[in-house]
């Protein structure tokens, strides 16, 4: 899980984005949950949910969808101007809002809400 957070952080940085600390902590809990849980694959074989999700592909999609959530959040805020930091920062809320649809799309169960508690 720690390595996947590092990969997500590097991917985001290459895209001129950054995760706030709470977002990184939530991702670490999410990846740990997926690594510890199992799900049957297309052949009915039990595999780690993280492997079913596709590790690197899942991380890339999480970064991209979290950026989309950030853009939506900023577009729908009452603020007229944003700092560069605000434009670059992906919050825990952005990450959390991107997770459930992504997991459902992969046929995986959404983890219990305690993974996103701070």
Regions picked out by a protein language model, each given a short descriptive name:
Residues 52-55, 91:
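Alpha-helix initiation/capping motif
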Residues 5-8, 59-67:
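Short, structured motif recognition centered on aromatic/hydrophobic residues
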């Amino acid at each position: 899980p720690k390595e996947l957070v590092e990969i997500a952080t590097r991917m985001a940085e290459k895209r001129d984005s950054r995760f706030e600390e709470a977002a990184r902590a939530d991702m670490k809990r999410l990846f740990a949950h997926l690594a510890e849980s199992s799900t049957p694959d297309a052949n009915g074989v039990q595999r780690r949910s993280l492997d079913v999700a596709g590790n690197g592909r899942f991380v890339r999609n999480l970064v991209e969808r979290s950026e989309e959530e950030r853009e939506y959040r900023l577009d729908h805020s009452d603020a007229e101007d944003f700092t560069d930091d605000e434009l670059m920062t992906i919050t825990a809320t952005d990450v959390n809002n991107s997770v459930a649809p992504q997991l459902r799309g992969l046929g995986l169960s959404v983890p219990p809400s305690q993974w996103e508690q701070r």
